[in-house]
Each structure stands twice: as C-alpha cells, then as structure tokens.
C-alpha cells in the first residue's frame, strides 16, 4: 500500500481491514494505516497478528504480536487511575514526536481435566516502548480550585523494555466456584539516549501475583481477588544529573529510588431477595501502596554547593527531587439496591458509598499526610418508554472532606442531576 505526496494539498489516507482468518493455520491478522498528513508529516501505522494452534486435544498455544508507530497523532488525555488519588490527579499523553510500541506474547496451555476445564498455562510477554510522553499533575485538595503540581508536571523520554514470565492455574476448588492463580517475574529495563547527557540504564525485577475466586449461583454470586501491581520510576525520577534549563527551578532525579508496589483487594457480592427480583450488592475495594515516589522541593536562600550533583545552586533557587514514602492506603465501599417497578416498566437503583484515603507526600520540604473522607448517595431510574426508547434519570449527592497534617482543611459538597436518552 503506497502513499503519493502532493505539494499543494494535504493528504489523508484511511485504510482498515477486518480480521482475516485462515482455517488451515489459524492465523488472524488485522492492519490499519491511518492519517498521513503531508503538511504536518503525521502518520499512524498499526499492525496486529495472532496465531492459534492445537498440538493435541489437551495442548495448545497462542502467538501474538502488535506494533504501533505514530507521529503527530492527536491523543486524548488519559487519567492514570493507578497512580492518581482523591487529592492528586495525573494525566499522561504521548507527544507528537515519533512514538513506537511493540508487544509480543506467547502462551502454552495444557488442559489437565477436560470435564471441568482445569488447566495450566505458561506465558511470556515482551513490550518495547520508544518515544516521548507528557505528564500533567494537579493538586486536588480543593476540587473546585485545582492547582498545577509543577513538581510532577514534565515531559520525559521513554526507551523501555519490559519482559514478563508467568504461570497460571485455573481450577474449581468447590462446586460452582472457580479459582485462578498466577505468579511470575517482571523485568523492566529503562534506557536513556540523550545527546547532551551520558547514557543511563537501570533494570528493575519484581514478582507478579494474582489470585481470584468466582462463585456463581442462581440467586447469589460473589467474587474475591488480590493483585500485586508494580511500577518502575520513569527516567525523570531516576536521572542522576541536574536539569538547570531554569536555573532558579532546578530538577534532579534520584537514582536510588525503589520501584513501587500496589496491593489491591476486591470483594463483590450480589444476592436476589424474595420473589420480586429485588437485588442487593456489596462492593469493597482496598489498596496498600509501598515505596510511593513523590516530589520534594528544597529551597536555597543563599548560594549552595550540591556535592552529590556537583552543581552550585544560586541564591533564591529551588531544587525538585524525588523520594520514596510509605503509608499510602485507601478503602472504598458501596452498597447497591435494585428493584423493578413493573407498573411503569422501570428499574430503580439506590447506591450509597464511603471512601477513605490516607495519602503521604511532601509540601515543599515538609512531609505531610492528607486524610480524605468521601461519602456518596446516588439514585437511578431506568425507564423503557417504548421498545426503542429508553430514558435514565439520575441524581447524585457527594461530599469530600480532606484534612492534612499542615492543618489545611477542604470541604466540598456536590449535587448533580441529569437524564440520558437511548434510541435504538
């Protein structure tokens, strides 16, 4: 597939093909070449391919590969839900420079018992990223007046290689209850290739663990899960040299930073009540974070020599660096009740929840901890007006109370109401 270029007009090419399936060798492919703009030299190339095959009636394997190369692509901001918290929001966006991402995966599956689908699998995955990213951060202590977090707002180069090996086991320990257990190792290598600085390379090795139980019955169901997430610091947080592009707002990484771990626990239960199809549900989610990397700002009233960085900070300047802190945890709970209203062909749902967050970080040079209390109440009414027209009416009440050890208090009360129409 070729692209011809003309000087006078910008060119927009769009080619997408559906999955191609070959029954003989179980090969699946999809490919798209999108948005080539002659004026801005924008392009986006994406290729996916997968191969599935069976060696015997119990042994099979899957091979997958994908590549995504783009330049100047219009990306939307994405909230980093695992790194963000109630009082801090992180958004990331790839730059409009060239970005490359390649993923590969190989899986071998062995069915131990075909009657109950008990099986074991071995997975190897690899991911390579090369490009630039922008990170934007906001302090949300006052949700109605968010403040830019300059210490955590920056652009950085990505040249990362991540490899992961896992073993997974799927079985049924009890009747109507399935269990999935997986464990393995993850290796992340960060490289830096910047002309003005020496090359830098660091490798992090961490375990991966996931355990889940799912029970399904006619009138009740429940699930419980634990997962260990791990995050390597980015190159800005690790860079051992000083960035003096602004001599009065210096920035330096910390090569001794540890990778952070997030332990997440989830419990979900639903039960049908009586003969009127009323249902009640409970959701509890908790997490504990270790070695959280946070920014710390040090101020210098007089000219100061920084021996570790071999640099002299001018008077009235500041230095942003990074440290690991301990003590982050949160818990979120929600109770949901649903009931049909047959007279108007509708369903009503009432949801009440409570969230608590304990978040340590630095304000300047001082370590502080913010405690956030977040109760909520939500109403939903789903009406089927006709076979093709549905309307959902909702009303939400939300209260956020944050207080930190610097005696700062924020109280915010929200009330929203709305309606949505669905025409099929």
Tell where the protein language model's regions lie, with residue ranges.
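Primarily recognizes Gram-negative and organellar outer-membrane beta-barrels
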Residues: 4-424
């Amino acid at each position: 597939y070729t692209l011809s270029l003309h000087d006078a007009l910008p060119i927009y090419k769009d080619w997408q093909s559906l999955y191609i399936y070959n029954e003989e060798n179980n090969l699946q492919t999809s490919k798209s070449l999108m948005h080539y703009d002659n004026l801005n030299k924008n392009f986006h190339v994406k290729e996916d391919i997968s191969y599935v095959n069976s060696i015997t009636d119990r042994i099979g394997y899957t091979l997958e590969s994908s590549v995504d190369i783009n330049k100047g692509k219009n990306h939307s901001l994405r909230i980093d839900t695992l790194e963000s918290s109630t009082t801090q929001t992180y958004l990331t966006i790839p730059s409009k420079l060239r970005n490359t991402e390649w993923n590969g995966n190989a899986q071998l599956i062995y069915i131990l018992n075909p009657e109950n689908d008990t099986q074991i699998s071995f997975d190897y995955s690899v991911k390579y990223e090369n490009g630039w990213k922008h990170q934007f951060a906001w302090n949300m202590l006052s949700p109605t007046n968010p403040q830019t977090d300059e210490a955590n707002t920056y652009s950085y180069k990505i040249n990362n290689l991540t490899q992961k090996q896992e073993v997974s086991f799927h079985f049924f320990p009890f009747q109507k209850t399935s269990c999935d257990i997986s464990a393995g190792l993850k290796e992340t290598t960060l490289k830096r290739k910047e002309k003005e600085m020496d090359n830098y390379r660091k490798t992090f090795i961490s375990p991966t663990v996931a355990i889940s139980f799912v029970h399904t019955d006619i009138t009740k169901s429940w699930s419980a899960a634990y997962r260990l997430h791990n995050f390597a610091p980015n190159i800005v947080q690790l860079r051992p040299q000083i960035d003096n592009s602004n001599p009065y707002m210096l920035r330096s990484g910390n090569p001794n930073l540890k990778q952070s771990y997030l332990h997440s626990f989830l419990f979900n239960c639903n039960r049908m009540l009586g003969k009127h199809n009323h249902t009640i549900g409970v959701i509890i989610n908790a997490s504990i974070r270790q070695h959280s990397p946070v920014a710390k700002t040090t101020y210098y009233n007089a000219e100061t020599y920084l021996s570790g960085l071999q640099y002299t900070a001018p008077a009235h300047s500041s230095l942003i660096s990074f440290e690991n802190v301990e003590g982050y945890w949160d818990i979120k709970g929600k109770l949901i009740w649903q009931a049909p209203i047959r007279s108007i062909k509708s369903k009503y749902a009432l949801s009440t929840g409570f969230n608590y967050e304990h978040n340590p970080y630095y304000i300047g040079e001082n370590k502080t901890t913010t405690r956030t209390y977040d109760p909520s109440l939500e109403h939903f009414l789903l009406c089927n007006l006709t076979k093709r027209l549905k309307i959902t009416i909702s009303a939400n009440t939300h209260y956020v109370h944050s207080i930190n050890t610097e005696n700062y208090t924020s109280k915010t009360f929200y009330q929203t109401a709305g309606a949505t129409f669905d025409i099929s």
